[in-house]
Design a protein with these regions (language model features):
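N-terminal topogenic module of multi-pass integral membrane proteins
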Residues: 1-123
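Alpha-helical transmembrane segments of multi-pass integral membrane proteins
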Residues: 12-19, 87-107, 121-136, 151-168, ...
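Transmembrane helix-loop junctions and nearby membrane-interface residues
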Residues: 20-27, 60, 64-67, 101-112, ...
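Membrane-helix interface and helix-disruption motif detector
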Residues: 24-48, 106-125, 142-149, 166-185, ...
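C-terminal transmembrane-bundle signature of multipass membrane proteins
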Residues: 4-7, 13-24, 46-61, 181-268
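Membrane-interface helix-boundary motifs at transmembrane edges
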Residues: 72-85, 113-115, 138-151, 200-209
């Protein structure tokens, strides 16, 4: 149902706007300019944390309502989840995949000036590969769940995000101010879970509602983390991942339809 897809995407957009604003204010006033240590007594860390909780609750409620609609069919395969106009799928796949790949290339070119340059280069290469895999997935989602390349394409974001989580933790572990990088860690964790849930369509274990919830929540966190200070390539990669998660979950939600026969079809 396209209406449900627009509703949850609009909810995520509004929540992300507030989350980004609060995070930007926190970055501006809650950390000392010289040391980077947190300033005591500020309300903005609590505002950001509260916004994350509110986003999780709102998106969970919207997904719960979608799940409990009577006589509903849920997509149970990758082609069913990605069913859309070939033009829409191609434009989304090429644009978002290219953004992720360009972010990886940017990171690769500037990795020499960053902490752990070797890890940054590997991360950049994975981002380029994941961008190409996403574009391929949107251009040819496959006729069956085990179609050649479908599993690899669905697995690439998982590999990218798992490695990025390791890199982020290694780079930030020396920072005593956990709140300075906590949102990024949460965003990467949520995006990793979202990618895992979406990969279930390719692996024959589809869970449409879980995939939609985690994709929307992870996109919210990725957008909320954008005001943080990071390399330009990583910034573009994070924005591209948010776009990819929103696009995938929009298509999946659009393909939740009234069942043709029987009470409920597909996989919730």
């Amino acid at each position: 149902m396209r209406k449900n897809a627009w509703v949850i995407c609009c909810c995520t957009a509004v929540l992300a706007a507030f989350g980004t604003f609060f995070r930007w204010l926190q970055d501006q006033v809650c950390f000392e300019a010289n040391t980077g240590l947190a300033v005591r007594g500020s309300i903005w860390p609590y505002a950001v944390a509260l916004m994350i909780v509110i986003a999780a609750v709102v998106l969970a409620v919207v997904c719960f309502r979608m799940k409990n609609q009577p006589h509903t069919y849920f997509p149970d395969s990758l082609p069913a989840a990605l069913a859309a106009s070939p033009r829409v799928r191609a434009i989304g796949g090429i644009v978002l995949g290219a953004l992720l790949a360009v972010g990886g290339l940017w990171l690769l070119l500037g990795s020499g000036t960053l902490a752990s340059p070797g890890l940054q280069r590997v991360l950049a290469v994975l981002a380029i590969a994941a961008g190409a895999a996403f574009a391929r997935q949107m251009l040819a989602p496959g006729d069956v769940e085990t179609a050649s390349g479908a599993v690899v394409c669905a697995s690439m974001p998982i590999v990218l995000l798992a490695f990025w989580l390791i890199v982020s933790y290694k780079v930030n572990i020396i920072n005593p101010t956990v709140s300075a990088y906590a949102v990024e860690i949460l965003a990467l964790c949520a995006a990793l879970i979202a990618s895992y849930e979406f990969a279930g369509f390719a692996y024959g274990r589809p869970k449409a509602i879980k995939s939609i919830f985690w994709s929307q929540f992870a996109a919210f966190l990725c957008i909320t983390a954008l005001p943080d200070d990071r390399a330009g390539g990583q910034q573009l990669m994070l924005a591209a991942i948010a776009g990819i998660l929103l696009f995938q979950s929009y298509l999946t939600a659009s393909n939740i339809r009234p069942a043709v026969s029987g009470p409920v079809g597909g996989a919730q």
